[in-house]
Amino acid sequence: MRNKYIEAFENAQISNKNVPDFRAGDTLKLAIRIKEGEKTRIQNFEGICIARRGSGVGETFIVRKIGANGIGVERIFPIYSESLENIEVLRKGNVRRSKLFYLRDRRGKAAKIKELRK
């Protein structure tokens, strides 16, 4: 049995944040608030969502992009994180898996995901 105060707090956190509907295979553009000393700035991170896990306030997702020199960069974000300013879905991917960890082994065109037809 969960504490009713914790449940009320989690529901308030979820209702405050406007999160778009996305799943694994979608290309996302994230605006992340970064604090360096006294200054804060927004850094964009664009990549493919390769996994979503958890539920409620503790739900997280993994975004993978190919950085400089072809090096893959993966970051894990809590969906309801205060540091996430904005989540924008750029493309909907047509995939048949909920976890796309096999993309870690793919390079170039083999790592492409087909776009979902409307």
Swiss-Prot record:
Domain of life of the source: Bacteria
GO biological process: translation
Keywords: Ribonucleoprotein, Ribosomal protein
A GO term, aspect molecular function: structural constituent of ribosome
One cellular-component annotation, GO: cytosolic large ribosomal subunit
InterPro entries noted in UniProt: Ribosomal_bL19, Ribosomal_bL19_sf, Translation_prot_SH3-like_sf
Entry function: This protein is located at the 30S-50S ribosomal subunit interface and may play a role in the structure and function of the aminoacyl-tRNA binding site.
PANTHER family, A to Z: LARGE RIBOSOMAL SUBUNIT PROTEIN BL19M (PTHR15680:SF9), RIBOSOMAL PROTEIN L19 (PTHR15680)
Protein family membership: Belongs to the bacterial ribosomal protein bL19 family.
Name of the protein described by the UniProt record: Large ribosomal subunit protein bL19
Source organism phylogeny: Bacteria, Pseudomonadati, Campylobacterota, Epsilonproteobacteria, Campylobacterales
Gene this protein is translated from: rplS
